[in-house]
């Protein structure tokens, strides 16, 4: 078991089945709950990135021609390695992201469960099909795109990347993986699990680095990019490929998600699901509700009072503190300051603070939950604040609640807490989002379903169960084993 004070020295870039010590610019990650150095390594150089792309191309033909059953066997061997390293991986996720250990353990379980679900999804959505016609066999098969880049996210450093990598490999692609620069240590352990699975050299390659490394990687000869992150970064990726439409992009870009509270009987249940919607993972889930839309009534007042009290009593701290915390820090001290500045701007726009978000410890990402009433604010920004911070909006009638919920250019998740089934039907019919939940947190999602949004939340390439769709392309064939002249020939042709 690693010590909190131990600095992990990087193994290097993972290229062609080997760890290669590089000499690029220094890259470091810190424990956001303490501000202490955790991992030290190097950014990938341009030469290392080009070499990784070369070996991925070289490995592609053999890997694509490997049977699906054999490719699936490697992914199951990967799961065995993750199982062996379950405790170490969970602890490392907590050290590098600040998540409570209970949440990191849940993430590791998601990594493990993803493989069988991805195999099932591939067989259901991209399995070969054949239909006999009068003239030939009509065949549908699927081929891999080629070399795909996976750009990892820090909030689920093992699970979200894995959600792209596993279906990409199952489909026969080779992978160039650039983790988030905030979570390189977790990425190294995940890649070591792939290495120990016996995966052939060149099939997966890992390149650590900052945004500049990512830009260099995207300029290579690649056929796909799978990204999870902010709208601003996703937009830059989209613009970078405006002259390369042949490269498939799967972009998941977050949201300014609404949660509507109806005139409910169980206020405590509404508070509980709202906390899970807004504050879990320190508000760093793309599905977190940012806007809480409550009735301007006694019910709304009571809900807000209890919600604020529960947030004030919430345990916040390092993952190894006792009693165990509900949330840890945001990913860095820099991000914490950015979120506090966003709160200040909302106050200047007319927002009324109910519970201030505050920095709890200098040089860390530890912030307390914040709540602000934006009902009377002028022109509130339609932006995602990736923090434990909720904006309150009040409504007088349910139609107004739906109107407020839809006042966003995003469209990832939306939720309704209500005892009224008719209201849910109205909500479902009128809300524009890729995930719509009823009496469940907005953060509740299942890997057995698609995961993706509309508007500025994505580009219509949902992941999770539908990831198989963007990892392979369909090939339609009309086939017959013997070359013959048809009995019924077209008019105007004479064959001697």
Swiss-Prot record:
GO molecular function: 1-pyrroline-5-carboxylate dehydrogenase activity; succinylglutamate-semialdehyde dehydrogenase activity
Matching SUPFAM superfamilies: ALDH-like
Binding site for NAD(+): 229-234
Full protein name: N-succinylglutamate 5-semialdehyde dehydrogenase
Any Gene Ontology CC annotation: cytoplasmic side of plasma membrane
Active site: 252, 286
Xref: CDD domains: ALDH_SGSD_AstD
Annotated S-S bridges: none
Residue stretches in coiled coil: none
EC number: 1.2.1.71
Catalytic reactions of this protein: N-succinyl-L-glutamate 5-semialdehyde + NAD(+) + H2O = N-succinyl-L-glutamate + NADH + 2 H(+)
Keyword vocabulary terms for this entry: Arginine metabolism, NAD, Oxidoreductase
Signal peptide: none
């Amino acid at each position: 078991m690693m010590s909190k004070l131990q600095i992990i020295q990087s193994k290097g870039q993972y290229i062609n089945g080997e760890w290669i010590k590089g000499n690029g610019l220094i890259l470091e990650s810190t424990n956001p709950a303490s501000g202490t150095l955790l991992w030290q390594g190097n950014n990938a150089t341009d030469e290392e990135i080009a070499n990784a792309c070369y070996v991925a191309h070289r490995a592609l033909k053999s890997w694509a021609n490997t049977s699906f059953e054999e490719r699936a066997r490697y992914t199951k061997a990967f799961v065995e390695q993750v199982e062996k390293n379950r405790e170490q991986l969970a602890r490392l996720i907590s050290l590098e992201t600040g998540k409570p250990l209970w949440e990191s353990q849940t993430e590791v379980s998601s990594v493990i469960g993803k493989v069988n679900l991805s195999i099932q999804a591939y067989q259901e959505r991209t399995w070969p099909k054949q239909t006999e016609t009068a003239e030939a066999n009509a065949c549908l098969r699927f081929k891999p795109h080629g070399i795909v880049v996976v750009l990892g996210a820090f909030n689920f450093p093992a699970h979200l990347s894995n959600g792209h990598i596993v279906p990409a490999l199952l489909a026969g692609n080779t992978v160039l993986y650039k983790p988030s620069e905030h979570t390189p240590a977790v990425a190294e352990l995940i890649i070591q699990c792939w290495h120990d699975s016996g995966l052939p050299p060149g099939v997966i390659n890992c390149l650590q680095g900052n945004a500049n490394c990512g830009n260099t990687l995207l300029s290579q000869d690649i056929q796909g990019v799978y990204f999870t992150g902010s709208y601003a970064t996703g937009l830059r990726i989209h613009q970078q490929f405006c002259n390369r439409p042949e490269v498939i992009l799967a972009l998941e870009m977050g949201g300014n998600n609404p949660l509507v509270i109806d005139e409910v009987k169980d206020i405590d249940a509404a508070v509980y699901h709202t906390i899970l919607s807004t504050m879990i993972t320190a508000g760093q889930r793309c599905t977190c509700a940012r806007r809480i839309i409550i009735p301007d009534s006694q019910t709304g007042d009571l809900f807000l009072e209890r919600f604020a009290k529960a947030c004030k009593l919430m345990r916040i701290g390092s993952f190894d503190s006792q009693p165990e915390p509900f949330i840890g820090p945001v990913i860095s001290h820099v991000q914490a300051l950015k979120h506090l500045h966003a709160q200040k701007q909302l106050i200047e726009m007319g927002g009324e603070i109910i519970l201030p978000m505050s920095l709890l410890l200098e040089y860390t990402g530890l912030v307390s939950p914040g709540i602000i009433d934006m009902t009377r604010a002028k022109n509130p920004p339609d932006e995602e604040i990736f923090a434990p911070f909720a904006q309150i909006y009040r409504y007088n009638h349910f139609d107004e609640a739906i109107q407020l919920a839809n006042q966003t250019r995003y469209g990832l998740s939306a939720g309704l807490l209500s005892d009224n089934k008719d209201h849910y039907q109205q909500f479902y019919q009128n809300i524009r989002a890729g995930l719509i939940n009823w009496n469940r947190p907005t953060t509740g999602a299942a890997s057995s379903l698609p995961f993706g949004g509309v508007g500025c939340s994505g580009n219509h390439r949902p992941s999770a169960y539908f990831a198989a769709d963007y990892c392979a392309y369909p090939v339609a064939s009309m086939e017959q084993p013997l070359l013959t002249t048809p009995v019924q020939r077209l008019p105007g042709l004479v064959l001697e």
